[in-house]
């Protein structure tokens, strides 16, 4: 799980969300050199369901800043690595976030899966309009891109800010999965609940 990929440090952003271009490359090389296969989230779930003995990694980005398009995407494209981007809809075209033009280019690449990350990035447990945030993001992204948006990422991704009701909403409105920021690998045990899957945050100090 990545957020911000840039050599430009952002003072008011958590260090856990920041990764330079060279650090991103180093993390990718770590997985390559240690026998991991890069797969889509859908492929990962099939591997687990079929109990295949395969080391794999799923690359995901949240929010997403435009530097993911300019700095991370060329590396992923060159290496033919699938990835998922979880879009906060009302961040599109905002300063430093992905532009509509770049999003539409990404949606045309079969390596890219587009997922939803709410309309405005609220703490869902404390949000009165949580159903709207969850459902409308799916509707809006499908309308903009023409893609089926089947995967969801919870803003902040911790149990303290995601309720059981929120998790049920994600299932009810038609998503196939919901991902958290709970730091654990995807295993047969951790994927029993497809609507609160774990992810491991990767940043500049991870490798």
Residue ranges with predicted function:
Residues 92-97, 160-161:
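Active-site glycine- and acidic-residue-rich loops that bind
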Residues 1-60, 67, 126-207:
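C-terminal active-site subregion of NodB/CE4 polysaccharide deacetylases
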Residues 84-86, 113-115, 176-179:
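Structural detector of well-ordered beta-strand residues that form the stable sheet scaffold
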Residues 32, 73-81, 98-116, 143-145, ...:
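Acidic (Asp/Glu)-rich catalytic clusters
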Residues 87-92, 120-127:
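Surface-exposed cleft-lining segments at the edges of enzyme active sites
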Residues 60-61, 115:
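Generic enzyme active-site microenvironment
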Residues 65-66, 120:
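Short active-site segment of divalent metal-dependent hydrolases/proteases
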Residues 4-5, 114-121:
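Histidine-centered catalytic micro-motifs
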């Amino acid at each position: 799980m990545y957020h911000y990929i840039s050599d430009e440090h952002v003072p008011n952003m958590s260090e856990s969300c920041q990764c330079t271009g060279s650090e991103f490359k180093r993390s990718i090389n770590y997985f390559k050199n240690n026998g991991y296969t890069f797969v889509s989230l859908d492929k990962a779930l099939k591997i687990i369901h079929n109990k295949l003995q395969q080391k794999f990694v799923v690359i995901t980005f949240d929010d997403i800043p435009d530097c993911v398009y300019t700095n991370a995407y060329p590396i992923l494209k060159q290496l033919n690595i699938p990835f998922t981007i979880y879009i906060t809809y009302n961040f599109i075209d905002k300063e430093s976030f992905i532009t509509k033009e770049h999003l539409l280019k990404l949606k045309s690449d079969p390596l890219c899966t587009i997922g939803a990350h709410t309309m405005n990035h609220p703490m869902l447990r404390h949000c009165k309009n949580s159903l709207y945030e969850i459902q409308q993001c799916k509707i809006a992204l499908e309308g903009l891109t023409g893609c089926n948006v089947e995967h969801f990422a919870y803003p902040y991704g911790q149990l303290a800010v995601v309720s059981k009701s929120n998790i049920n909403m994600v299932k009810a409105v038609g998503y196939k999965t919901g991902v958290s920021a709970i730091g654990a690998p995807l295993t047969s045990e951790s994927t029993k609940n497809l609507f609160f899957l774990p992810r491991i945050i990767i940043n500049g100090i991870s490798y």
